[in-house]
Amino acid sequence: MSYLLSKSRKDHPDKNGEVQKITPKTANWEYVGFEMYHLQEEQELTFDTENTETCFVLVAGKATIVTSQATFEHIGNRASPFERIPPYSVYVPHQQKVQIKAESYLELAVCRAPSQGSLPIRLIKPEDVGVEKRGYGNNKRLVHNILPETETADALLIVEVFTDEGNTSSFPSHKHDDKNSQTETYLEETYYHRFSPSQGFALQRVYTDDRSLDECMAVYDGDVVQVPKGYHPVATIAGYDNYY
C-alpha cells in the first residue's frame, strides 16, 4: 500500500469517533493537519486548537459548537455531502478550546494549519460559500469554496469537489510544490474521499516530473490521499460519484 494513502477506520473508530488523523509529523511535511470524526447523536468532543488555526466542517449531520466567543446552535444542513449543497463550517484561531455536541449522526472534518494569528472566530454559512462549476466534457466537477485564498485565514485553504462518475478532476494535471514560483501557490493537500454508492472507488495518481515520486492508488470511501508534492489527478469509475 502506498505511504500516501491513509485507510479509513470508519468500521472501527476510536471511542471518540476518530476515523482519520493526519498530522505534519505523520505526513512528513510542514503544515497541514486533517482529522475526521464520526460522532453519534448526543456525543460530545472538546478540541484544543493549540498552535493552529482550525476549521470545523460539518460534512454531514447537525451539531452545536461552543467557543470562547460565541455559540453556534443547531448548525448543519445536510444528511450526506452528496446532497451537493454547501455545508456549515466554523473557523477558530489558535489557542482556543472548542466543544462540539452532535445533534444527529455527525461527520466532522477538522482542518488545521500552523498559525499565531488572532483572526476572529466565525461561522461560515452555506450562503458564504462560493459555488462554481469547472471543466467541460469528461472533466467536469462542482466546487464549494469553503475557505478560499480570497477569504481571511493565515494558511488554510478548504474546498469540496464533486466529480461525477466517469470524469476526471484535479485535471489538467497541476502542482503546488514550488515555494519560489511566481505562478504556483505552495500547498500541502489532503484528499478525503467519499463515494456514492459507498462501495465505489476512484484512482488517484501522485507524481513528479522526474518520477522520483509516482504513486497510483485505488481509493475507497473514507480514505485520505496525502499530496506532499507533484501532480495529483483523480479519475472516477462509471457508476460511482466522488466527493473530496
Feature map (PLM): residue ranges:
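Sequence termini and other peripheral, non-core segments
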Residues: 1-9, 14-16, 21-24, 46-55
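A short glycine-rich, His/Asp/Glu-containing loop-to-beta-strand
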Residues: 14-46, 139-190
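Conserved hydrophobic/aromatic beta-strand scaffold that supports enzyme active sites
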Residues: 34-38, 55, 89-91, 110, ...
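Glycine- and acidic-residue-biased ligand/ion/polar-headgroup-sensing regions
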Residues: 50-74, 165, 177-223, 235, ...
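Surface-exposed beta-loop interaction hotspot
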Residues: 104-165
